[in-house]
């Protein structure tokens, strides 16, 4: 029943090392990773598969757990936790079990088109038991539509694609800390027992050497009061803690004799003002820590407590606190305060005594998608539980059925609220394939139950040694979220407790094995770990006796080879996917690398994608896992190929058809388009890429273009990161992208009658309607520009008293003469493009529309945006800049063979930013384009040095090859230096670039060679989403604010440019009185004056004198509202009356000119301007 949707959470193949039909990349890597990168979307998929209990997940878990062990899904766990729901007398109970899903209601495309959820109906079995009569009634109950994950790890909510981001939170457990007392400068110690849900329990030793306890953040009291309340006698406390002076002195001073007194004392502190009884005090303590419904450590909390305190026992055991937990915690605390280093646990285990580092990844865990949704379902079910209890008491016991008890609305509301409004359910970043992939692998420390931006200090944001191989130290946003939002490292995975694990290769006595083990951060701390690039010989033995290793806390030391336990599996283990796509990362400053990783996510997919000459080897894997490619599931032969679909006949004789998505709009307005890579008759293998997605080239991530770059200043036009481009980029559409905008209009019922979508619009000429069809909707293929009508719509006006003439016209022409106003949807200011799609939804066609809406039309307009001055370009090393000038090809500097360069970058952009990786990329880019052939018999010392490390398959590389230089394991300086000496000459036998990567360039304007050789080569440049077309804005007349009558601000409101306080000072300083007066009155908020000026300009008269600005009148009203009597005096000292006599004059002027400069301030209101 569930086969369809659960394919959505199937595990992706872990190995794509040998993708059939993939491009060849010549790799400089020296280290072969023993394992492939795990599925990059497993973080999302596996978690959701656990939540819904996908069949593939269940089968795999059952195989791992062994026969006879029950495997439960997240939804089953939560129903078991809730059941049974009993009434107050415990005579009746309701049990929920066996969650299951029916088939999907809609396809993914249908959900997007109709603005609905991609969801499957969820059913559970509800069993009602009446203990008095022994009657059991069982029914299947529909709980609601449950949003399902697509095969790309996303959800479709109300037609838009969303991602649920994993949350980094402090793990439940027991945490010891140390602080220094400011007065005595002595260390004080404390401990917090933090549950998954329930009251916090805190113990501490204060400066007077007493041990205290706080329950649920209330007032502190002696710890022995709590111990006596738990039933311990003074003698038992002395037997357990007799070794500790501070515990004995606390016991003497606590002032309670027995359990009853202790319970009452705790109750008074917890509930001041209420009269305590022994029973209520006992219930309060029980409820706080020992009732599973009120206190839950969760499996992870129990695991952490048992590990820290050396308690044995099963992690599936008690989820509440036990008396032993509390006693061992107090013993650990007093021994820590006494300066002891180890203790023996009650189980007889020797455990170390140390304070905890809250920022350590052993103490921070991930709440992944499944757990976040599970928590939300728990909230909904607990609300439902209250309703069930009430109905059990109010309904007749005989007639009760499970369906009459259950109200499913709280559950579906909780799920809907989470997906729609939670901080962790985010609008998917679909700028390109990489941005979507990175968004799904994001780790967020913010959100409900997490940190807040304002309170997060430096420590929690900083890079921690335990992040190694788990969270990328480089990829994080700039700005207020720095360090709070991260990205999962490339080899990391999440274990069932939510801790992030990273893999290591086992080493035995200096011998490296192929055995790989995954460790959490606190397990890793116990081992001695070597780097991935530690040299070893063909027999997998270390070649050096002393090895550089990482010890606990990130310390680096040198130890004998025999002491090494493990080594890293790959040099790119510590970085995320986006960071691993930066070649020569090891030569870039971290700040610039951060910008490089972030800016790749902002790259716009170009018209024709082109894979980078200089890659890192992860491009293919990233594109494959991002889910935007079409991959052949089985081997076969291509029967038919068109732009819209591909048909393959597989080897078993079954025909498969793959539909391609063409020019769809993404969340960010970029174009999502798939292109076939195969031809009719081609043989394809299983796993082969048969169609490219946006920003991919032959199955590899391809976000930019390889451009011929020269590093030189050019007449100051590339000062301060400005970029000079060749006109070829514009003419040949090298940096051209397609952007798609969606416009929506609906026809509603109004008080005066229904709105109507029509071609019959009042006061509009036939030329304006030329591109509209008979329904009044623009035709597909029409070229439109700002102001053009996309959909004609009329709205009824208020009926006024008709004159006899109008009544006569009504009688003759019928409805035609009725009063309607034009409310058509027009192309917004500054937008142009071609109409590529129209969708019409109407009530008549049984489309699901909002209340009061009769018809809705969506129009898609595509723009082809060529590169232009003001657009932002960037490399992969944080080297960003704005296009300052586009030069004709003939003016660009050119190489001796006549090739003009494509782009000129300023040399000053390199040294102080310390991103030298871009220079090395330029040299290797040139080598990849030219090719190279190494003379193995050369006496050149540079070539000899290179041959020591260069892999043999790189001795002879043809021109126009793709290379890969993996992070921390790429081409060395010696290799680049040797290869520059071995590059292939051009067809004239000339090597255009010398041994230092420099060329003799010639000035395109004069034909004179430049004085010095210039670094020239190929760099991969990205066009970022910061396009000047979306930012440029100008206003003549437009909407005004209702209160101040000043123009609104911002492009979205079609606002003006603010002439602020400092600009006014500048005008005053220059004595430009008339200009200033004009700016502050008729150009702004002199309501009457601005209409008169408009009139004077239209009639060709002189500009009249300005009046009084509206904001001055607002100021007066403000002062009067504070009960201040304010008078305005004329020049002669007589009081002036600021009346609104001008209103009539204003209206008549407006009517005469046919303009209306009043407008609602809301951005969604219709702009109605002159």
Swiss-Prot record:
Family to which the UniProt record says this protein belongs: Belongs to the RNA polymerase beta chain family.
PANTHER family listed in its UniProt record: DNA-DIRECTED RNA POLYMERASE I SUBUNIT 2
Reactions catalysed according to its record: RNA(n) + a ribonucleoside 5'-triphosphate = RNA(n+1) + diphosphate
Gene3D superfamilies linked: 2.40.50.100, 2.40.50.150, 3.90.1100.10, DNA-directed RNA polymerase, beta subunit, external 1 domain, DNA-directed RNA polymerase, subunit 2, domain 6, RNA polymerase alpha subunit dimerisation domain, RNA polymerase Rpb2, domain 2
EC number: 2.7.7.6
Organism field: Corynebacterium urealyticum (strain ATCC 43042 / DSM 7109)
Job of this protein: DNA-dependent RNA polymerase catalyzes the transcription of DNA into RNA using the four ribonucleoside triphosphates as substrates.
Family annotation (PROSITE patterns): RNA_POL_BETA
InterPro entries in UniProt: DNA-dir_RNA_pol_bsu_ext_1_sf, DNA-dir_RNA_pol_bsu_external_1, DNA-dir_RNA_pol_su2, DNA-dir_RNAP_su2_dom, DNA-dir_RNAP_su2_hyb_sf, RNA_pol_bsu_bac, RNA_pol_bsu_CS, RNA_pol_bsu_protrusion
Keyword Transferase in record: yes
An example Gene Ontology CC term for this record: DNA-directed RNA polymerase complex
Full protein name: DNA-directed RNA polymerase subunit beta
Keyword Protein biosynthesis assigned: no
GO biological process, one term: DNA-templated transcription
Domain of life: Bacteria
Keywords, in A-Z order: DNA-directed RNA polymerase, Nucleotidyltransferase, Transcription, Transferase
GO molecular function: DNA binding; DNA-directed RNA polymerase activity; ribonucleoside binding
Root EC class: transferase
Pfam families linked: RNA_pol_Rpb2_1, RNA_pol_Rpb2_2, RNA_pol_Rpb2_3, RNA_pol_Rpb2_45, RNA_pol_Rpb2_6, RNA_pol_Rpb2_7
Assembly description: The RNAP catalytic core consists of 2 alpha, 1 beta, 1 beta' and 1 omega subunit. When a sigma factor is associated with the core the holoenzyme is formed, which can initiate transcription.
SUPFAM superfamilies cross-referenced by the UniProt entry: beta and beta-prime subunits of DNA dependent RNA-polymerase
């Amino acid at each position: 029943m569930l086969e369809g949707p659960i394919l959505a959470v199937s595990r992706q193949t872990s190995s794509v090392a040998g993708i059939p039909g993939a491009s060849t990349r010549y790799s400089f890597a020296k280290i072969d990773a023993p394992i492939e990168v795990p599925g990059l979307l497993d973080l999302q998929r596996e978690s959701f598969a656990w939540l819904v209990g996908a069949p593939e997940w269940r089968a795999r878990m059952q195989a791992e757990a062994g026969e006879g062990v029950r495997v439960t899904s997240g939804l089953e766990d939560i129903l078991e936790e809730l059941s049974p729901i009993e009434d107050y007398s415990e005579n009746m109970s309701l049990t929920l079990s066996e969650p299951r899903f029916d088939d999907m209601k809609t396809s993914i495309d249908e959900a997007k088109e109709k603005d609905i959820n991609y969801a499957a109906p969820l059913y559970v079995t509800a069993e009602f038991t009446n203990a008095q009569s022994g009657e059991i009634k069982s029914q299947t109950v529909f709980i609601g539509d449950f949003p399902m994950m697509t095969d790309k790890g996303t959800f479709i909510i109300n037609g838009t694609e969303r991602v649920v981001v994993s949350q980094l939170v402090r793990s439940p457990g027991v945490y010891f800390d140390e602080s220094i007392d400011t007065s005595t400068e002595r260390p004080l110690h404390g401990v917090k027992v933090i549950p998954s849900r329930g009251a916090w329990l805190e113990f501490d030793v204060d400066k007077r050497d007493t041990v205290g306890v706080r329950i649920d953040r209330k007032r502190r009291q002696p710890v022995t009061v709590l111990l006596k309340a738990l039933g311990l006698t003074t003698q038992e406390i002395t037997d357990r803690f007799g070794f500790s002076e501070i515990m004995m002195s606390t016991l003497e001073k606590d002032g309670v004799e027995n359990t009853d007194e202790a319970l009452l004392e705790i109750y008074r502190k917890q509930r001041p003002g209420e009269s305590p009884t022994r029973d209520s005090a006992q219930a309060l303590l029980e409820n706080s820590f020992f009732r599973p419904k009120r206190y839950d450590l969760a499996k992870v909390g129990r695991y952490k407590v048992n590990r820290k305190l050396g308690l044995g026992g099963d992690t599936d055991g008690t989820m509440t606190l036990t008396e032993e937990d509390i006693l061992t915690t107090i013993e650990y605390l007093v021994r820590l305060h006494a300066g002891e280093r180890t203790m023996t646990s009650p189980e007889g285990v020797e455990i170390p005594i140390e304070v905890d580092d809250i920022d350590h990844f052993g103490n921070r865990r991930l709440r992944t998608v499944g757990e976040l949704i599970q928590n939300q379902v728990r909230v909904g079910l607990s609300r439902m539980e209250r309703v069930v209890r009430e109905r059990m008491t109010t309904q007749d016991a005989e007639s009760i059925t499970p369906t009459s008890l259950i109200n499913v609305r709280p559950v579906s509301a909780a799920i809907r609220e989470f997906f729609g409004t939670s901080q962790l359910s985010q609008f998917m970043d679909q700028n390109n394939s990489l941005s979507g992939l990175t968004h799904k692998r994001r780790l967020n420390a913010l959100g409900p139950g997490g940190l807040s931006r304002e309170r997060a200090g430096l420590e929690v944001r900083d890079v921690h040694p335990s992040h190694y191989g788990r969270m990328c130290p480089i990829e994080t946003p700039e700005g207020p979220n720095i360090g709070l939002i991260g990205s999962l490292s490339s080899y990391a995975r999440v274990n069932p407790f939510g801790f992030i694990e990273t893999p290591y290769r086992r080493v035995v006595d200096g011998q490296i094995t192929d055995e790989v083990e995954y460790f959490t951060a606190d397990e890793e701390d116990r081992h001695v770990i070597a780097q991935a690039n530690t040299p070893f010989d063909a027999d997998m033995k270390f070649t050096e006796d002393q090895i550089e290793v990482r010890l606990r806390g990130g310390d680096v030391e040198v130890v004998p080879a025999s002491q090494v336990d493990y080594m890293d599996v790959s040099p790119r283990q510590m970085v995320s996917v986006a960071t691993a796509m930066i070649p020569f990362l090891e030569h870039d400053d971290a700040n610039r690398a951060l910008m490089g990783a972030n800016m790749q996510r902002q790259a716009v997919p170009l018209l024709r994608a082109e894979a980078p000459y200089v890659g890192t080897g992860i491009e293919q894997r990233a594109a494959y896992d991002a889910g935007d490619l079409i991959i052949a599931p089985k081997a076969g032969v291509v029967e038919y190929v068109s732009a819209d679909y591909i048909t393959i006949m597989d080897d078993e004789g079954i025909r498969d058809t793959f539909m391609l998505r063409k020019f769809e709009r993404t969340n960010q307005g970029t174009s999502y388009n798939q292109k076939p890579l195969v031809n009719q008759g081609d043989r394809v293998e299983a796993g082969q890429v048969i169609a490219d997605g946006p920003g991919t080239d032959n199955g590899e991530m391809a976000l930019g273009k390889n451009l011929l770059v020269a590093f030189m200043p050019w007449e100051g036009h590339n000062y301060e990161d400005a970029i000079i481009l060749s006109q070829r980029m514009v003419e040949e559409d090298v940096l051209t992208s397609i952007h798609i905008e969606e416009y929506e209009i609906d026809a509603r019922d109004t008080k005066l009658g229904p709105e109507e979508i029509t071609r019959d619009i009042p006061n509009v000429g036939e030329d304006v309607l030329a591109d509209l069809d008979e329904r009044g909707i623009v035709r597909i293929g029409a070229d439109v520009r700002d102001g053009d009508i996309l959909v004609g719509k009329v709205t009824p006006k208020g009926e006024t008293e008709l004159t006899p003439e109008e009544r006569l016209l009504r009688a003759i022409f019928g409805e035609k003469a009725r009063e309607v106003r034009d409310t058509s949807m027009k192309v917004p200011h500054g937008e142009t493009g071609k109409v590529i799609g129209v969708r019409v939804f109407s009530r008549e066609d049984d489309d699901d529309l909002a209340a009061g809406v009769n018809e809705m039309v969506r129009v898609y307009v595509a723009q082809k945006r060529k590169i232009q001055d003001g657009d932002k370009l960037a490399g992969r090393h944080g080297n960003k800049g704005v296009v300052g000038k586009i030069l004709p090809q003939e003016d660009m500097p050119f190489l001796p063979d006549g090739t003009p360069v494509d782009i000129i970058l300023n040399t000053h952009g390199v040294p102080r930013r310390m991103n030298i990786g871009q220079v090395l990329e330029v040299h290797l880019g040139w080598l990849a384009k030219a090719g190279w052939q190494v003379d193995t018999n050369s006496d050149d010392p540079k070539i000899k040095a290179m041959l020591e490390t260069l892999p043999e398959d790189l001795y002879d590389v043809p021109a126009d090859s793709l290379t890969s230089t993996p992070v921390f394991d790429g081409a060395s300086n010696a290799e680049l230096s040797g290869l520059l000496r071995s590059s292939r000459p051009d067809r004239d036998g000339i090597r255009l670039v010398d041994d230092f990567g420099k060329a003799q360039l010639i000035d395109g304007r004069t034909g004179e060679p430049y004085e010095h050789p210039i670094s020239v080569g190929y760099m991969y440049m990205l066009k970022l989403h910061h396009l000047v077309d979306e930012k440029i804005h100008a206003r003549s007349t437009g909407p005004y604010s209702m209160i101040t009558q000043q123009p609104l601000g911002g492009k979205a409101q079609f606002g003006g440019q603010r002439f602020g306080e400092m600009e006014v000072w500048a005008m005053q300083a220059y004595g430009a009185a008339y200009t200033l007066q004009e700016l502050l009155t008729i150009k702004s908020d002199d309501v009457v004056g601005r209409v008169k000026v408009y009139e004077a300009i239209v009639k060709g008269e002189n500009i009249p004198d300005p009046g009084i600005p509206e904001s001055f009148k607002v100021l007066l009203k403000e002062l009067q509202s504070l009960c201040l009597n304010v008078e305005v005096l004329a020049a002669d000292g007589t009081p002036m009356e600021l009346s609104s006599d001008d209103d009539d004059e204003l209206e008549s002027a407006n009517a005469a000119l046919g303009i209306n400069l009043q407008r609602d301030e809301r951005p969604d209101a219709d702009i109605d301007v002159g």
